[in-house]
Each structure stands twice: as structure tokens, then as C-alpha cells.
Amino acid sequence: KMKNTLQAVSNHKFSNILENIGNSDITHNINFNLFKKIVKGIGGLDTELTNQKKFLINIGIKKRAEIISAKQTFLKKADMYLRLQRLIDEKQMGSLFKVMLIKNKNNKFKLGF
């Protein structure tokens, strides 16, 4: 059972959602299984679900980082690498965040999935 699903994050830590308004990221845990069931009940729609790591890698985040960092200093490259790792590492944001595509069943679009 999910509870306390509306959350605020400030400086990489959970914070009170009503404090520091405008300087916190607000997130919400979604019950994707329920969401898929609702979409399926509508009819004519299809869903794809993956984690943030797979999605970002499939849309080329590593290649993009390589292109951007080509003319950067070592320190900037290292910083970019650490940021990229945070986004795609399974122990950080890579498996924590999910991406869902809802599309018409006849649509073959699957970029990132």
C-alpha cells in the first residue's frame, strides 16, 4: 500500500513540501500497475514502461554526453560523468524513476523503450 506519495526534494534530501516553495522539486509516486489497468480499460491504447536508465540510454544520453564533453576541460568532463552516473546508475536514479508511454495501439512509436 502506497502512502505519503507526494514528496519534495531539496538539495538531494527529502524536505517539507510546504517549506522552501519554488526551490524544491516535487515528486509523486505513481502506481504504474493501476495506471496501466486504467489505460487498458479505455481501449484502443497501449502502454510501454521502463526505468529511467534504460530510457535515457535508449535515446542516446551517453552519446550526447560524449559530444558535449569533447571540447571541455577534464574537470567539466568529470562533473558531467558524475551527473550522468547519478541519472543512470541503478543504485541512484536509474531504477528509481520510471517512464511510461501511452499511445494508440496502431502507433508503432517506441523511441526510448
Annotate the PLM regions.
Residues 1-113:
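Long, Lys/Arg- and hydrophobic-enriched amphipathic alpha-helices
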